[in-house]
Amino acid sequence: MTTSAEKRVPVRVGVLLINLGTPNAPEPGSVRLYLKEFLSDPRVVEIPQLVWQPILRSIILTTRPRRSAEAYRQIWTEEGSPLAVLTARQARALAGAFGPAVIVDHAMRYGQPAIAERIDALAAAGCERILIAPLYPQYCAATTATATDEAFAHLRRMRAQPAVRTLPPYHDDPAYISALARSVGEALAELKFQPQTILASFHGMPERTRQLGDPYYDQCRETARRLGDALGREVRLAFQSRFGRAEWLRPYTDASLRALPGEGVTKIAVIAPGFAADCLETLEELAIRGRAAFLESGGSDFAYLPCLNDSAVCIEMLRTLIGRELEGWLAPE
């Protein structure tokens, strides 16, 4: 069925899906380059660079790449990094979804393909308007804002700028909650055990970001609450991937997985609704290390349920969210 957005978009419109990024290979050298770019972003590490850079270069980048490379090797596929593969598939699945006038591409905030490179490619293809679409349901300065920062920084260098719009966060959007509920419901139906608890694990952030006014924590809570309502059962909240010595958002996922068996919860399903596609944090940190921690602590059954990835429900959701934003861009009479 032809949508009104398809009928009315201008000659060329670009849609740029953006996710976090990944090393090019599961090797220490590649991981080091990736971590250097990622951890040098002041949106990610909010410490004065004069203080932070010596720590990053002399300690973190000399020790962490080897450990991280081993973790990446455990989840790497023949096609490459799961995050890179799945994000590319999402873009391909949306090709043609809004008519031939709309070009859908993808980029990574860190690593390749770079945001600047893909904006240039869309402009070269004749796109007069570009929708920047960070694939982060919950807004956070360290994810959503830095993606748009990078896009706008490149726009500042362009002589002929396209018109630009950004996809807003969609943590409570009915299309997103419905997609999550359908995906989780279908995955639960395939399990050979009945989980006593569903644990929704979101990427952690320093507690300080919440105190400074970042809405991320509240949006994660709202997503978990709405998903629980849609499923008709409680969804517990936790935060993973903490880094450094500072206090991060609680409860911590790893601590929760170790504590739950002692509370009588021995059968669990873990989901990661803040991630648009499976990646190191879900496939290694949750599905491998999280499983081991839960079972070693007395749990009997553990299931990690996949992210939305490039599933039919995900593509339907993205069509709804993106199509809504394209509605405002009318073709010249």
Placement of each model-derived feature along the sequence:
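Active-site-proximal alpha-helix that buttresses catalytic centers in soluble enzyme cores
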Residues: T2-E333
